[in-house]
Amino acid sequence: MLKNINPTQTQAWKALTAHFESAQDMDLKELFAQDAARFDKYSARFGSDILVDYSKNLINEETLKHLFALANETELKSAIEAMFSGEAINQTEGRAVLHTALRNRTNTPVMVDGEDVMPAVNAVLEKMKSFTDRVIGGEWKGYTGKAITDIVNIGIGGSDLGPYMVTEALAPYKNHLNLHFVSNVDGTHIVETLKKVNPETTLFLIASKTFTTQETMTNAHTARDWFLESAGDQAHVAKHFAALSTNATAVSEFGIDTANMFEFWDWVGGRYSLWSAIGLSIALAVGYDNFVELLDGAHEMDKHFVSTDLESNIPVILALIGIWYNNFHGAESEAILPYDQYMHRFAAYFQQGNMESNGKYVDREGNAVTYQTGPIIWGEPGTNGQHAFYQLIHQGTKLIPCDFIAPAISHNPAGDHHQKLMSNFFAQTEALAFGKSEETVKEELVKAGKNAEEVAAIAPFKVFEGNRPTNSILVKQITPRTLGNLIAMYEHKIFVQGVIWNIFSFDQWGVELGKQLANQILPELADASQINSHDSSTNGLINAFKAFKA
């Protein structure tokens, strides 16, 4: 089990608090001027394909010394061992946390309740391989004998965000199949998707562990009704629907052949489930071999995370730097900024991964914490973000640490597009770190022909303070393997922070109350009668909704 250690009571936390008093005056210009080897000292390579540069952070050797001491005092190493060994570290739900077993490519036994889960994991992978080979190869036929052309994945949360993010990121590896993702219970999402597909050549994947998720099953029934308008015979459902679920009874009642039901387990959290059968849409989009490459990449990062000393451990370093800003500098958010259009959903994916995991105000003993936990995660691809929100990052009053991610090799080397993209990638972190002084601004204005009065008037608005921290993550190329590396790296960063903050990162009770109340409100919307069973605001909104509909 995970230890219950209040981080604020550790010697390291107290040392960091004292260190912060002097560290507030850290200046990145000075830090780089004082140490010509700073980049070499504060960067790390993962294999031959990924470079993580964390030198443009407001840290020095003393900062890192105290942060690593914090990791040791909160017994991070034993927590890592507990997760990988199958202990039930998701204590509020009594579950192990073993998404890492799904990508365990060594087949080393992984025990849960005395049973090795690897034979079951590998059996599902083999079933996925057989299924994807048949669909991609055209052997799987629809009810009129035509091959499948379109896949519609119906899920929500982890059953949607992960597969969608990955299939978009790996679009250069796509085969002939067209992928569609439906998640929102708003009827617009399913209706607009169904307009694009042909019932004779469409395969629906219904991704719901329990086969009871409201949004997913509402969309699934709408899809089935639409399909049967053309197919007619209920028996044809089996040729056009597959299930990613564990509820065989409900799957069968829906009309899906349980031979086309792909299992996963309660030790797989939704936001970590793309490695499981939930990733079937990924395998269909890019082929099973590329899906395995994705697993291999994640497994490589798992091995690094488990076996590397904390001081050289990339997810640990990133997590600790995040804690430094979150808990000592008072930063409330972090931006993830991929300079790769294919990765346009990467920030959204880890918005869920981080905020659902570490958005907790109660510690592992059930007490309200007295310190900050999970940050707000957001971001968009570069260079779009530069023309949207970078203004605030550069010259606003909020401290926003940023991760910049970019591939050295583009999948689309059109003209000089990639050089221009990368020039912006390099320029932004340099500008954020070192800024532009008032002296430089005035010199530029004078050279531009401005008189003294004009210079004095405009100069303050053109000054960049700098000292805005960033990590730069340079990848040789975005491939299934390197994408697997990156996803696992961020997963483990989130885990490390949760361990140190003494919270449970693998439950998500915060999503339950809204669902519970929605289930109570739903029958109240069935007719035009006035509602007075809630607070005045909710009553007023419901009654106004009914009036608008009348």
Swiss-Prot record:
A Pfam family per the record: PGI
EC category name: isomerase
Main subcellular localisation: cytoplasm
SUPFAM superfamilies in the record: SIS domain
Domain of life: Bacteria
Enzyme Commission number(s): 5.3.1.9
GO molecular function: carbohydrate derivative binding; glucose-6-phosphate isomerase activity; monosaccharide binding
Keyword Cytoplasm in record: yes
Gene Ontology annotations for the cellular component aspect, listed alphabetically: cytosol
This protein's record includes keyword Protein biosynthesis: no
Catalytic activity, reaction form: alpha-D-glucose 6-phosphate = beta-D-fructose 6-phosphate
Pathway involvement of the protein, from the record: Carbohydrate biosynthesis; gluconeogenesis; Carbohydrate degradation; glycolysis; D-glyceraldehyde 3-phosphate and glycerone phosphate from D-glucose: step 2/4
Similarity comment: Belongs to the GPI family.
Protein name: Glucose-6-phosphate isomerase
Species assigned in the record: Vibrio parahaemolyticus serotype O3:K6 (strain RIMD 2210633)
Lineage: Bacteria, Pseudomonadati, Pseudomonadota, Gammaproteobacteria, Vibrionales
